[in-house]
Amino acid sequence: MVFQSFILGNLVSLCMKIINSVVVVGLYYGFLTTFSIGPSYLFLLRARVMDEGEEGTEKKVSATTGFIAGQLMMFISIYYAPLHLALGRPHTITVLALPYLLFHFFWNNNKHFFDYGSTTRNEMRNLRIQCVFLNNLIFQLFNHFILPSSMLARLVNIYMFRCNNKMLFVTSSFVGWLIGHILFMKWVGLVLVWIQQNNSIRSNVLIRSNKYKFLVSELRNSMARIFSILLFITCVYYLGRIPSPIFTKKLKGTSETGGTKQDPEVSTEEAPFRSLFSEEREDLDKIDEMEEIRVNGKEKINKDDEFHVRTYYNYKTVSENRDGNKENSNLKFLKIKEDPFFFLWFEKPFVTLVFDYKRWNRPNRYIKNDKIENTVRNEMSQYFFYTCQSDGKERISFTYPPNLSTFFEMIQKKISSFTRAKAPSDQVYAYWSLLNEKKKENLKNEFLNRIEALDLDKERSFENILEKTTRFCHNETKKEYLPKLYDPFLHGISRGKIKKLLPFKKITDINIGIGGSWINKIHGILLRINSHKFEQTIEKFTRKSLSIEKKLSFFSEPQEEKINSEEEIKIFKFLFDVVITDNNNKTLIKNFIDFHEINKNVPRWSYKLTSELEELEGENEENVPTEPGIRSRKAKSVVVFTDKEPHNGIFTNLKDNQNSDQKDEMALIRYSQHSDFRRDLIKGSMRSQRRKTVIWDFFQAKVHSPLFFDRIDKLFFFSFDFWGLKKKIIRNFMWKKKKKEFLKKEDEQSKRKETRRIEIAETWDSFPFSQIIRGSLLVTQSILRKYIILPLLIIIKNSTRALLFQVPEWSEDLKDWKREMHVKCTYNGVQLSETEFPRNWLTDGIQIKILFPFYLKPWHKLKVQSSQKARLKKIKDKGEKTDFGFLTVWGMETELPFGSAKKKRSFFEPIFKELKKRIKKFKTKPFRVLSIFKERATIFLKVTKERKNWIIKNLLFRKGKRKNISKQNIIPLFGVREIDELNETKKDSIMSNQMIYELSGQKKSMEWPNSSLNENKIKNLIDRIKIIKNQTEEISKEKENLTNRCNKPRYDSQIIASSKKRWQAFKRKNIRLIRKSFFFFKFCIEQLSITFFLGIINIPRITTQLQLFFESTKTILDKYIYKNEENGEKKKNQKNTIYFISTLKNLISKNKKFSYDLCSLSQAYVFYKLSQIQVSNFSKLKAVLEYNICITSFFVKNQIKDFCQEQGIFHYELKDKTFFNSEVNPWKYWLRSHSQYNLPWIAWARLVTQKWKKKINQDFLVLNTSLIKTDLYEKNKIDNYKKQQFFEANSLLNSKHNLKKDYIYNSFCYRSIHSREKKFDMSMSIGITPDNCLVSSFLEKYNIQVIGEIGHRKYLDWRILNFWFRKKVNIGLLIDTKSKKKYIKTKVQNYKKIDKITKTDLANQKSFFFDWMGMNEERLNHRITNFAFFFFSEFFLFSSTYKTKPWVIPIKLLLFNFNEKKNVNKKITLKKKGFIPSNEKGPLRFFNLNKEENELVGQGELESDNEKKRNPESALSNQEKNIEKNYAESKIKKRQNKKQYKSHTEAELYLFLTRYSRFQLRWNCFFNQKILNNIKVYCLLVRLKNPNEIAISSIERGELSLDILMIEKNFTFSKLMKKGILIIEPVRLSVKNDGQLIIYRTVGISLVHKNKQKISKRYKKKSYIDKKNNYDFFIPENILSPKRRREFRILICFNLKKKNARDRNSRFDKNIQNLTTVLHKKKDLYKDKKTLIKLKSFLWPNFRLEDLACMNRYWFNTTNGNHFSMIRIHMYARFQIR
């Protein structure tokens, strides 16, 4: 067994060695390359097939040798780098192919010119054979077209780095290709032989017919020529994508000899957002790196492998400005000194210079966005292979920085003494592990020492024991440090905060803007400046329009100039360095202090290109070149809006004054619905072939590779609309031929109209001055119609009505006439406004649209308020009738421009209709009288006939009765007996005989002697019984007949019945009136008194007396009613209990329209009554009002009170007995203030009646403010639905509090990974007792106003989100001035205004009146609505829950900014906050309303210094502000090349498009016109001041559909995507992600914990701490700094000693372990793997986030984060969000 296993093991290992050997892999790759067929195969096959004879064999040999030689060159190019560069570049094909193709073309066309005749001595002199060899050699180097070999080439390149013996790999791959090629050619030969031998195939050829013999012979003779033409076409197809290297125009680069003006451009070309780690900004992917480190005015540049040392000397001369010479005022010299010691020249190969297709004259693509102006040069791939040390071992890294490797190679070449001794791998690893062990031990010792110091030195503070962060110091004596923003030793938040700046804003620091008011007062008087540049800067600083309003406005004002260049900042510094010597205006100018900046430049292309789209938009008019360099998608600019009003900016320039008369236009780009083949490529650049994409639609949104077809949801390769096909089949089956014909006619008619309309439009365009004539005619027609024709018609109509003794309708007609609007439109139909004409309307054309056209009516109908159903029906009927039209040249109206005229409404048509109706009525009146008379006569005759017949029948019946009585025998005992007429059935006779026999038998037995007598008696009795039965039956039958006759329905009987019913109904109504007469009379008296006293109410003397009289009479009446009701209720209670509320609810459910109106109630009366009643809890009123159980009187009955008490709505017994304090507030706000029951309907549904009643009563016992019990708190089940009350402290508490907070965050970090149990509450049990601490300290720590409004606070860090205000609202600093008592030291707290978000707002969110893009300008203070929830309704629930409980979802995982809508009341804000109005000038000041408040502000200012000492964070926050200020200044410098916006509206449009149009939404054809109509209406509504009327009318007409406005709540985007209505096209932007963004998107979980909850006297929140998980446990590692802490954890977790030190490529070594030993250790490997997975899952969320985020830039060296995210997904498990 052991022997067998040994043999098997050897065989397996042998097989593995053979498979992994270099020779086998090379053979495999070589065999695969045979399938990549190129154009050289055509030559080879032609030589093998077409050529025959001795020359043919020679051609075959030369073809095969050339083919093999070409392929050998390709394989050698894999090993030899210069040859690979030469053959791999596209310009190689350009240089080699074009001349050779021309030669080949002339060779085949003019054979006699090159033919020297064949010589048998030396066939190599024959040029034909040489050309065959060259054809196969050269064309083998060209691109392949049947199976492209790019994938194979990549595999070969990867394996070349893995294997050691590279030459063996190349030779083996060539041998493999040779084998495959021989097999392929043999297969081709066999196929040809089979075709020759098969007669059936040869017989089908056209040669057998005599007609085509000549053609076929010609075809064979000219085969070479046809072949050369085809080859030329294929090669031109390839060469068409390649730019010509000689004749293309080179782009103009930016000149580098611009002195100091060009210097800032070179030095600051990097992304504007600096990250926390400045080294992350460095792009290590480039060879030509340019490093620039300015220290003390010196600069080092590494550019194009040349080292220069440039020294800039900046001199400022001591000048005298007596003569006013401008040239000597600002002198600057630039001196370039070249040092020969630092000058090094590195050669460049000729191949890279000639054949670098990207460096030849232009790049492939030009990627430009807001962050990067010039495109980055990308000379190499983002993957670069090189050896590096990782974990103590030397490994091949595929993302090694290429600049380091090239630098190392250059140094090795130039410095001969530089040698690198390679140490063995085991020794390197041992050294590395030893080093890490030492580090771990040092950290352990330091950690233990610090812990011991905690126990020993208890008097020391925690701050001294904690590890301090190290700072980078460049001057130890003065202790000067680097700024925190640039300090490499600082990590995380201490590196400074980044202001999120908008891309179009030109930001100036607020300190500079405010300080500008006093700069010129001092220096402007003392200093005389003659330079033009100084004048501009002074003009900028003299502007005093800067205020907080404009600083925090939604759109920044246009700023033509900005303080961003280095020179201007130096001039600004110059103002502070001026020293005045004497009156002769001599100035001594100090030398400038150089600006030290550590930065790094990325190599970029030296030119800037503009696209065709930018030229169309007209941007950057100053710097735009003559021709755009980038080919953009075909588009047209459509002018939407022109603004004549000037916008006053912060900074102005001379250009604004010059162009003040010009109009400010807003244009949108309209794209054509065609595929974009241009793809923003640079003109003349390489057109790369897109092999991976497959396009099957005419216009496909998302082009992708066939590899991803499995991810498509469709079943088939092409989309198959099954439901659409089914509908079509059903429709075709159901419809008849007539309908089809009718539809065809309609379609033809509409097509005719459309063609006619197009023809008319084309005719107007064809003539030269037609648009001028048409435009002038349209304007005259509109003026004539509006101001002459229609007023004349109104005058004629009303004068004729007055003559005909009818009331004239002047007001109605004039109202309709004023409503008509003539809107000017562009030639395409885009609406502008009534007064605004489109640009160049005389040349481009104009359309005039008539909105609400006036039609003259003979009379106006009275508008009765119709129901909603009637209104909807009316809208449906009017759906086809359009309430607008376009004006024609002849004064007619059309539905579409250049369409057919509409039929006018006739003025006389309704008159004729009315006349016809009246004539008909007049005719029908006499005929109605005759018809009624005839009906009455027929009824009378019918009644008389019926009566006559009834009398006759009664008489006949009586006669028949008399005859029957005479025939009968009278028996005295039994009455009348009939003998003759007996009708007995057989059955009755048989039964009677049986009974008689039985009776007779019994009698015989009992009474034997008298049996005969008894029998006779019995017989007689039986006979009499039978007769009686028969008689009763007959009588009953006759009665039935009589009743049937009498009950027949007659006309008079119906009348009688209906009259009875009417009488009964009248009786009931009278009873009801009698019953309710008292209330009716009372209501009448009230109405009469109100109407009587309304006229006299304005007289002041009478009003008071009247009011008292009215109130006294009303109280008397109410008391009387109340007594009567009480007596009635007592009687009812004695009999039975009637549930009043249930009956009332039943009444309401029966009649749903039943409602009451409380608007008629007087507010004064309500407050008067409330002051009389001693009740405080009126929250029941709200509940009653919400359920429409509205009662006119506010005296609620006892039945309602009992019912509410049973249901738990309120507790009547626990009402407050104190007097009610009625504040004079608005009525609606007073009612809304009682919001205890404003819970969502889900909460109401879950609550059980009785339990909820008990709990809510207990809760209100605590919440009642007047009760004495303060510390009572009981936990109930509706805590989740109650409004949580939280606050945020504005300043840091003491150090212990900070430590506790830090422990909570750290413990959360630990427990969120490991704990998979129930959710925990991280609240801390910190109670604030009012006895121990003063009120002043409490007020100083916490914000009073926040505590007051604590139910509405949103405990969320709003600094993360951006607020976008539409109008410039005065948002000042909110000042807390609520507490006005003198003995309390209140501190003025400045904090940001935060939206009030409650559960009621989230549950009952109602969108305000139709507002889109700010068209409802009457409401200035609301926010922009975010339509993300209407598209993605599934996120709405999560967002609403997050706003009330933000600890559920981390804030960084929310994908949107939810902008809440809010209307700010100006009166309230004036009372509570101080702000600076826009027209106020001067320094920043706060104003208060009361003197006490001013005193408090003064106290707050005095306490600021003391607060800095007490509060450690105040100084830190100031430092952060300084960092932000410096950061803003640096950003100001770096934004000088940014896009200058011409106008305010252009910036607004840009912001709107970037914020809301990040995705291009495309729609289907049937959805297209509807949306376009909506957009046209929007464009009109944007320009109107009060667009409410037009918006409503357009909604009614159907022009503006609400479903497109996304007002529906369940309007989901996924449904539209599935239906195919909307298709999203993402705008792909090349954005360079910031390091801070990467870290804080992964690390920063900004949770607001429950420890920020309100803790007051009445609320002591209990801390719910799980027993198993001690979340507030002390973490000793916090003693160390975060950096050392992370390092310590990683070193502990990595088991360095047990790690195997073998290399990855060890399987190629000879000293490989035996397979059996590996198999035995499988279990241990599995355990290690499990521990490694645990280790990774432990390290990922805690310690390695920053390292992995940096790894995206360093280790993986990618500009996009896709590779990084994929690695993260595969390596690390997902974690639940807690």
UniProtKB/Swiss-Prot annotation:
Residues 1498-1520 are annotated as: Disordered. It is a multi-pass membrane protein. The chain crosses the membrane at residues 18-38, 67-87, 90-110, 132-152, 175-195, 226-246. It is found in: Plastid, Chloroplast inner membrane. GO terms for biological process: protein transport. Its main location: plastid. The keyword Cell membrane does not apply. Part of the Tic complex. There is a partial copy of the N-terminus (positions 1-341) of ycf1 in the inverted repeat (BAF50071). Belongs to the TIC214 family. This is Protein TIC 214. It comes from Arabis hirsuta.
